[in-house]
Amino acid sequence: MKSKLLFALLFISQVIGASNGTIKGILQDSATKEPLAFASVSIKGTTQGVNTDLDGFFTLEVPEGKQTLTFTYVGYTSADKAIVVKANETVEITIDLISESVQLEGVVVQATRSKSREATLLIEQQRSVEMKQHIGSQELSRKGVSDVASAVAKTTGVAKQEGSGTIFVRGLGDRYNSTSLNGLPLASNDPEKKNIDLNIFSTDIVEYIAIDKTYFARNYGDFAGGNIDIMSKNHTGAGFVEVGVSTNMNTNAVKQDHFKTLSDRSFFGFSDTKIPGNALKGYNFKNSTQTDTRSPWGAGLNINTGKSFFFGGESALHLFATASFGNNFKQKEGVTRTAQAQNSFTKDLNLNSFEYSTNTTGMLNAKFDINDANSIKYNLLFVNDSKEKNDEYQGYVRDITLDNSDYTFINRQTYRQDQLMVNQLLGNHKLNNQLDLNWGAAFNNISAQTPDRQQYTLNKLKDSDSYQFSINSRSDNNRYYEDLKENEFAANIAADYKFGKNEENLYNGKLTVGYNFRKKDREFKATQFVFQINREYNNNINPNALDQFFNQANFANGYFDIYTFRGGAGTPNALLPQTYDGELSIHAGFVNVEYRLTDKLSGSLGARFETISQDVTWQTQLDANKTNNKFTKNAFLPSLSLKYEVNDNNNLRFALSKTYTLPQFKERARFIYEDVTEIKVGNPDLYASDDYNADLKWEYFPKTDEVISATVFGKYIKNPINEIVSASSSNDITYANTGDYGYAAGLEIEVRKNLFSFDDALTNKITGGLNASFMKTYQKLDNEKVNRENKYLSTSFTHDNASFTGASDLLLNADISYIKEWANDQKLMATLSYAHFSDKLYSLGTEQSGNLVDKAFGFLDFTFKYDFTKNFGMTFNARNLLDPAIERKQENLTQDVLVQSYKLGQNFSLGFKYTF
C-alpha cells in the first residue's frame, strides 16, 4: 500500500513539474539599449514575479501555456507581453521599455535617457553597491542652475568658492579633487589650478553629474575630496529643435552711469591680440589704455536639436547638438587690504571693479548603435570663455604713496580668454551574456591666454588735480602677456565578466579588469613689458587719458623706456619670454570584484597600481638658465565598498580607500606671478601627499523620489600641501608640505521629501530638500619640517595647527518647490533655495600675522518656470536676494582686522524657449 502511494505521489510530482516552463530575458531601454536593473517582471494577475539583475537579466519559471508577463520600471511605460510556453522548455526574449510621455497617438517615439530624472538617479543610488551621488538635468532645471560649478554646489558636502568655479568637496580644495567628462579626464584652463573652471560649462550640455566622494579603482588615484564626472546629453527620441533667448542684469552694474569695459575687445569674447613687433624699439601696442562704456544688460541665445535615424531592425544613429552664447555684466565696490601682525596696513585700498564675461559653447554627440550588443559614440565639445575686468584701486600703498600725495591710484585692466576643445570616442560591446568590453579615448586641447593685461600706478598730489606715475619700481606700470597651451591624451579600456550563476540563473558576481593611460603636456610662457618713466616728464598726468602719455611720439622723445625682465632694446634675447613646460604621464592597471555575498550583503573590492611621472622645466627671472625638476611615484591603491540591505528601503554602506595628491606644474616651477596685492612663486621641493579615506552611510528611501541619509566620513592626509607666506622681505606666497599629517572628519545629512500632494491624477505637490555637512578639519604645522625640506624658502607659522584652507565647518543647502501640472500640458514650477557657508580659512598666517579667514555668508535664490504649452515656456531667476557682504578678516593675536569686503549685487534673468 505504501509503495503504491509513493508511486502515485512521484507520478503526480512529475506531471506537475513537467507542466512548467522557463522564460529568460533582458529588459532594456528602447532607445539606448541600456539594461534596466531591478525592474519588476511578473505574471499578470498574480503575485508571482522576479526583479531583473544589475544587467537587466531575469529568469522566471511559469506554468505551461499562454502567459502574459507585466514589465514595470520607474520612469517608463509599463508593458505586457503574451508568451506561449511549453513544458520543460526555455523561451528567451528581449523587452524594450519606452520612457513615459513618449508614446503619442499610437506611434512609438524614442525617448531621452532616464538618467536626467531625479527619481531614476535615486533608484540607481539605492541599488548600486558603490556609494553614489548625482544631480540630473531635471533637478538643475528645477533649481534654475546655469553652470556646472553652481550645480555641484547644490549637493551635500560641496561648496563653490565665491567669484570662481573652484570646488571644495568635504573641505578639500582644488588640488584634492578631479574632474572628467564622460569618464575621461579634462585639462585645466588656469595655470594655477589642477581642475578646469566648472563655471565655463553650461548646463545645456549636461544630462547628469556624478560626484564620487569615495574612491573606486576605475578612477585615477589623484583624489581625496571627490571626482566630478559630467555626463553629456545624448538624444534618443523624436527629432526636435529648441530655441531659447534670455536677458539678465546685475543690480550693481545697472546702477552705474558709465559701465567701464576695456577698449578694442570683442563683444563676443574672441580676441587675437599678439605681442607687437619691435616691442622694445617703439611703442607699438595695439590696445588703448583707456576704457569704453557699454550698456550693462546681458543676453543669451541657445539652440538645441536632436534626431534619430534607424537602419533595419537593430542599427540606429542618434544625433544631438547644442550651441549657445551668453554674456554677463558685474560690478562691485569694496575694500582690499594687506595687514601686518600689529594691525597696521601695508596696503589699504578702495576697489571699484567692472567685469564683462562671455561664454560660447558648442557640442555634438553622435551615437551609432551597430546592433543590440555594440555601440560607438563620438563627443565633440568646444567652449570659448572670456572675461574682461577693469579694476580701479584708490588708497594707500606702503613705499608707493608719497608724503606729498593724497592717495595712490592703480588701474589694472585684465582680459582673459580660454578655449577648450574636447574630442572623445567611446565604445560599448556585449560580447556574450557574461562578458562586456568598454573603452574610451580622448584628445583634449586647451588654450588659456591673458593678452595685454595693463597696470598703471599713479599718485594724486596734495592740493592739486595733478597725478604722477609711481616710479618706485619699473613693474608699477606694465603690460603683460600670458599664454598657456595644454594637450592631453587619455584612454580607458575595461572588461566586465559576470560569474557565480545562482539557482535563479542570475549572476552574483562581476569581475572588472582594466587599464588607463593619461599623458598631459603643458607649455606656458609669459612676457611682461615694464615702463621706466623719465622723472623730467612725470607730471600733470591724466589717469583717464593715458594714451596722451603712452604713445610713439613720447617714446621717441624719451618720456619713457620699455624693458622686459632680461633688459631693454640693447640686451640680446630680451624678448625671450619666461617659460615653464610640464609633462605628466600615468599608466594604471586595475581590478575590481563585485559580489553578492548573501541576500542582503554585497561587496566591491578593488586594487589599482599606477606609475606616475611629472617633469617640470622652467626658465624665468629667478633661474635665467633652463632648469629641470622631475619626480616619479609608484602607487598601490586598494579600495573596499560594502552594502548591507536592511530591508527594501534601507541600506547601510561602508567604504575604505587609499589615494594620493600631486603638486601641480606651476607650484613646482620657480615662476613669479604678480597681482596687485600679492606675489606668488613656485617651489620645486614639493612632493605628493598620501590620503586615507573612510565612509559609513545609512540611507532610507521612503518612495522612489525620496531619500533620507546620513554619512560619517574621515580622511587622513600624510604630508599635506598648503599655500603659505614665506619668510622674505616681499612676503611672497608659495607652496610647501607644511606638516606630517592632517585630517578631516564630519557628518553629512540629506533629506528629499514630498511634503504635500494635492492631486492623485496630475502632479500638484510641494517638495522639500535639505542637505547639510558638519566638518572638523585639522592639520599640524611644522616650521622645522618646512625649513628642512625646502631649499628656496623658510617660514615661521603663527600657529602650530590650523584647519584646512577652504573648509567650512558647516555647509547647508535647503530648497522648497511647488510643482503643478494641468491636462493641457501647462506646467508650473517655483523653487526657493538657500545656501549657507560658515567661516573658512583662506590662507595660513606667518610671522605672527593671523590667519586669513573668509567669514560666513549665505545666498537666497528664487526660480519660477512656466510652460504655457508643451512647446513654449519661460523661466525667471532671481539670485542673491539677500546680497550679504562678502568679508575676509585677518585674525591677528590682538584683534580681527577686516582686509576685504564687497557686495555682489542681486542678479535677475528672464528667458523664453520654444520647441519645434
Which stretches of residues belong to each language-model region?
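Surface-exposed extracellular loop regions of Gram-negative outer-membrane beta-barrel proteins
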Residues: 185, 468, 545-567, 613, ...
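Gram-negative outer-membrane beta-barrel transporters
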Residues: 712-716, 735-840
